[in-house]
Amino acid sequence: MRKVRFRSRTEHTLDTKGRLNFPRRFSDVLESFESQDLIIAPFKTHLRIYPLAEWEELETKMHNHGGEQNLSGWVRYVVGGVVEAALDKQGRLLIPQTLRLDAGLEKNVVLNGMLSWIEIWDATAWASEQQAVRDGFEDFSEGLRNMGIL
């Protein structure tokens, strides 16, 4: 069976309680997992949403290698900041205020599928990130060649 992935991006508005309407195409992917539980993790400039199974794989990697290469501070930041979550009956996801503040999320956000997880960016930060990627696109050439894409 082919693994289903999170793809594409959508723009959303957080309501006054910090909830966002979770895109149907992302919830369809989530349904392919045994558990519908989600993990929301801080990631410096944005948040990441992981299906529980994907997060548990990442936790195993952190457990096995987190003490290497002086990563304990990063593990502390990410693991200490995670929140377990689930979609409500209306298909909304509550982003806790602590995580919204940590990632600088205002009212307008962008959800971006990253195959195994979803990113949540403040819309202004997303625009800056995208411009930086466009400006440095040639920097990806070697890696893309190594993967056989170029």
From Swiss-Prot:
UniProt-listed InterPro entries: MraZ, MraZ_C, MraZ_dom, MraZ_N, MraZ_sf, SpoVT-AbrB_dom, SpoVT-AbrB_sf
Extract the signal peptide range: none
User: Can you say where in the cell this protein is located?
Assistant: Cytoplasm, Nucleoid
Please give the Gene Ontology molecular function terms for this protein. DNA-binding transcription factor activity; transcription cis-regulatory region binding
Q: Which UniProt keywords apply?
A: Cytoplasm, DNA-binding, Repeat, Transcription, Transcription regulation
Keyword Membrane appears in the UniProt entry: no
PROSITE patterns for the chain: SPOVT_ABRB
Gene3D superfamilies documented for this protein: Transcriptional regulator MraZ domain
Naming one, the record's GO cellular component terms include: nucleoid
Which processes are annotated in GO (biological process)?
negative regulation of DNA-templated transcription initiation
- Which positions, given as ranges, span the membrane? none
The SpoVT-AbrB domain extends over: 9-54, 82-125
Q: Name one Pfam family in it.
A: MraZ
Q: What is its main location?
A: cytoplasm
- Which family does the record claim for this protein? Belongs to the MraZ family.
In terms of PANTHER family, this protein maps to:
TRANSCRIPTIONAL REGULATOR MRAZ
- Subunit and partners: Forms oligomers.
What protein is this chain from? Transcriptional regulator MraZ
What is the protein's species of origin?
A: Desulfotalea psychrophila (strain LSv54 / DSM 12343)
Q: Which gene encodes it?
A: mraZ
